[in-house]
Amino acid sequence: MAEKKTSTRFPYESTEYRRARNRLLQSEIKLRRQIEAVAEQRRKLPLGGVVKTDYVFDSAEPGEGAIKAVRLSELFAPGKRTLFLYNFMFPQAPDMDSPCPTCTSIIDTVDGAARHVTQRVNLAVVAKAPIDRFRQHARNRGWQHALLLSSSGNTFNHDYGAEGENGQQWPLAHVFVRRGKKIHHFWTSELWWAKPEPGQDMRHVDFMWPMWGIFDATPEGRSKSWGPSLSYP
C-alpha cells in the first residue's frame, strides 16, 4: 500500500479554511482516541449477573421460515460466545400499537449489516409484539437477515430495563456472553437513563445508527425537530 499523505489541500480552498480544518482534524484525532479508550474500558468490564431464566421467545426469520420457540441459550451459535440483542419498541406503549419509527430506522441499517456482524457474534432483535406482527413489519421494510424474536410470552423486556411499569417499551441494546453453561449479562446501553446534554437526546445507540454520523458531517447537522418516519412522500 502506498504511503498516505500526512497533510492535504483541496482545490481552491482558502488559507482560512485550511487553518480551521486542521484544528478540526486535531479534535477528530482526539475523538478517535477517546472512542477507542471507551471501547477498551467496555471490553474490560467484569462479567455481569448470571441470567437466571432461560427465556423462551417466539422466533422467525424475516422471510418465509417457520415460527418456532427458542430459548435464550439457543441463540448462541456454536463457536460464538457473545449475543448482541436490540429491544425494538413494538408496540411503543399499551396505547400506541404501531412499531416505533426510530427503532425501524435503526434496524433498516442493522439488517443490512447482519450478515457481516454474525460472522463474529450472534445477533437478534426482540419486540413485545406477537411474532407474526413483527415479521409482517419486517417484510414491509424489506428486512432479510436479522433474527426476529417476540418476548410476548416472557418477562425479558421488564427484567432487563426495556419495559416500564405501565407497559411502555424502551429502545435498549444489550450484550450477553456465554461462559461454560452460564449466560451472563455483560453490557446494556445505560446512557439511555443518563441526563442528556442541553439540546440533545440520549444518543445511547448512535454507535449502531449511522444516519446521525452522516448528518454530523454536514453543515445542517442534526435537526431538533426532525426524526425518522415509517414512510415519506
Can you say where each PLM-predicted feature lies in the sequence?
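Non-globular targeting/processing and membrane-anchoring segments
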Residues: 2-83, 88-115, 119, 137-139, ...
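Conserved segment of the thioredoxin-like fold in thiol-based oxidoreductases
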Residues: 122-152
